[in-house]
């Protein structure tokens, strides 16, 4: 069972423009303690948009 202090927790990436949650990924809390922001393709917008970590 995953604990809340997991080193690699699952995170959801949401589009900044349309706010749809399009991607699920893992991140390392030790290397990236802040919220993650990646530019990825949004199928709802049809273009590449910045996606931010949502909780």
Curated annotation (Swiss-Prot):
Top-level division of the source organism's lineage: Bacteria
MF terms in GO: structural constituent of ribosome
Coiled coil region boundaries: none
Entries under Pfam families matching the protein: Ribosomal_L33 (PF00471)
GO biological process: translation
Protein keywords: Ribonucleoprotein, Ribosomal protein
Any one cellular-component term (Gene Ontology): cytoplasm
Stored NCBIfam families: PRK00504.1, PRK00595.1, rpmG_bact
UniProt similarity note: Belongs to the bacterial ribosomal protein bL33 family.
Descriptive protein name: Large ribosomal subunit protein bL33A
Organism: Mycolicibacterium smegmatis (strain ATCC 700084 / mc(2)155) (Mycobacterium smegmatis)
Record gene name: rpmG1
């Amino acid at each position: 069972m995953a604990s809340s202090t997991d080193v690699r927790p699952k995170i959801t990436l949401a589009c900044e423009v349309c706010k749809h949650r399009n991607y699920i990924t893992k991140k390392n809390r030790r290397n990236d303690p802040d919220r993650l922001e990646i530019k990825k393709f949004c199928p709802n917008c049809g273009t590449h948009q910045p996606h931010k970590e949502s909780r």
